[in-house]
Amino acid sequence: MKIPESEFNIQIKDNFLSEEDFKIISDVGNKIRFNSNDLSYTNKENNHVWFTADAPKIVEDIIKENVSKFFNIKILNLNVCQYSMVSKSKKTEVHNDFSEETDFQTILYVKGNPNIHSGTGFYIKEGDNQILNTHIGFNPNRLVSWTSNVWHAPLSFSDEFQPRISLIAQYKLK
């Protein structure tokens, strides 16, 4: 499947959730014991590891309701809603999540070092290369959204990076 060219439509909203809803999401994230059954590898060359755990229904419902209301969109399907813990890596793991089932996604930063180096980088393609164009720092309860064909990566390669927990969601919109 050919990935369509991407224009950036990245939106950032600090204090996205109410204190009550963020506490629920944060409490669930803090109780997760990420282990070897939760590993996700990006590719065979680098084997950068993401630890993931599916979010419970209460968290899915909070995310769907708030994203739908904030962006004034109708969500047909929530394809992915999972906690992700990213560890430090030596290389950038640039990727996009485009598929027929996913056209919009969000990351809600939950727990980590609140600085730019624990956030997410957004890239443009120049030939066979991806060039960092925009980076967004980590801040708890910050929601970042973009279309699924945008190239992105955690900024986990910098010296200042510390492990972070985020809530990743991917949607099919009406």
What spans do the regions from the language model cover?
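Non-heme Fe(II)/2-oxoglutarate
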Residues: M1-Q82, S89-K91
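Catalytic core of non-heme Fe(II) oxygenases with the double-stranded beta-helix
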Residues: V80, S84-K174
